Design a protein with these regions (language model features):
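C-terminal cap of metal-dependent C-N hydrolases
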Residues: 9, 323-372
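Divalent-metal coordination cores built from histidine and acidic residues
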Residues: 74-156
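His/Asp/Glu-enriched, well-ordered alpha-helical/loop segment
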Residues: 250-331
Length: 372
């Protein structure tokens, strides 16, 4: 006897779409295809709806030690997100106070900020990225202590933090010494973004790829900087990191015209961005990408199988035996509009509207509009 059967769904398994049903038993995916509904304690009819692996947000702020952090129970579960990466909110001095030892309602991993206090001062003043201030021995100790929770180092390279590329070069060195990756915030840097990309290697993450302030991935002629392309060829990964203020439709269109799409679709949602018209949630970020021309399956991969592979989450795919982390969406068209950091507004020609979230076989959120 199955615990739950989702029938008549449009399934996305982390790679492709197909029609069928999915059964859950004891917190795991028990069958995919056409399991018999009479063998289920609960049957949920998903006719006209899309069922995906629980989404994975590659760039969120939820550590709980800075002013910008959102509650993952609010920022994730109502939007089909069952796992997320905190993008550097905690430093070596605050990590153990934040939640690496605390039970979360979602699967969680953390980038450790190179700065000791992380983002705890962010709304008052920018963090100090001077490498002379980093507590490298303490950072190394934390990576030894929390190998499953920590997935890399984080540094911000906006002009408010750094005047030259030395901090990112030193952060790369430190990351390599720890056998980990570096995520670099590249939004309105003091130097060409290509100079930062030049320093990154395989597995490192360049976030805020499509931001439109100052120096970015586009050259003056509107083409993607060759150094950015070369970085991708070396295995550097590119994240959206939307946050509304870090996403310009015009930049995305130009890059997409050259086939330069993101590897991951991180929302960069914060306490103020959550439910705000700009970023709102991860499904809204995915909806923007598809509306702007990204293939639907490719966009969903950037929030399921791809971040699962990059960060080592167990989910991201529909497969028998996997944890039943699932999301159900209605795909809508012509409902409202999207805005970007420059104030451009476009019609929402594609909108992922959440209907249900399951975490390890338990229904943890359900839309009141859809009783199943």
């Amino acid at each position: 006897m199955f615990d739950t059967l989702f029938k008549n769904a449009r399934l996305f398994d982390g790679e492709r779409f197909f029609s069928g049903s999915l059964a859950v038993k004891a917190g795991k995916i028990a069958a995919i295809g056409d399991p018999a509904p009479e063998n289920a304690a609960q049957v949920i009819d998903c006719a006209g709806l899309t069922l995906t692996p629980g989404l994975i947000d590659a760039h969120l702020h939820f550590a709980g030690v800075s002013e910008i952090d959102a509650d993952p129970a609010l920022a994730c579960l109502p939007y089909g997100v069952t796992a997320a990466v905190d993008a550097g909110g905690a430093g070596e001095n605050t990590l153990e106070a934040c939640g690496v030892l605390r039970r979360r309602p979602i699967g969680a991993k953390y980038f450790l900020n190179v700065c000791s206090a992380g983002f705890s001062s962010l709304r008052a003043y920018p963090e100090n990225v001077d490498p002379a201030r980093w507590q490298e021995d303490r950072i190394a100790l934390l990576f030894e202590r929390y190998p499953e929770a920590l997935c890399g180092l984080k540094i911000r390279m906006g002009r408010e933090c750094a005047a030259d590329t030395r901090p990112v070069a030193e952060a790369v060195r430190l990351a390599r010494s720890l056998s980990t990756r570096l995520m670099v915030h590249v939004s309105d840097p003091a130097m060409p973004a290509g100079e930062i990309a030049d320093l990154l290697g395989e597995g490192d993450i360049f976030t805020h790829t499509y931001q439109g302030r100052g120096n970015g991935i586009l050259l003056a002629d509107g083409t993607v900087d060759p150094r950015v392309r070369e970085a991708r060829e070396r295995g550097v990964l590119f994240d959206v990191g939307d946050a509304h203020v870090h996403f310009a439709f015009s930049v995305f269109r130009r890059a997409a015209g050259e086939g330069f799409f993101p590897d991951t679709a991180g929302s960069d949602v914060t306490d103020r961005g959550l439910c705000a018209p700009g970023a709102f949630s991860l499904p809204v970020v995915l909806s923007k990408l598809v509306t702007l021309g990204m293939d639907e399956a490719a966009a969903l991969r950037a929030a399921t199988s791809r971040p699962a592979e990059i960060f080592g989450f167990s989910g991201g795919r529909l497969r028998v035996g996997a944890d039943a982390d699932l999301a159900v969406f209605a795909v809508l068209s012509g409902v409202g509009s999207f805005t970007d950091s420059a104030g451009e507004r476009i019609p929402a020609n594609y909108l992922l509207s959440p209907r249900l979230t399951m975490r390890r076989g338990a229904l943890v959120w359900r839309s009141v509009e859809w009783m199943g």
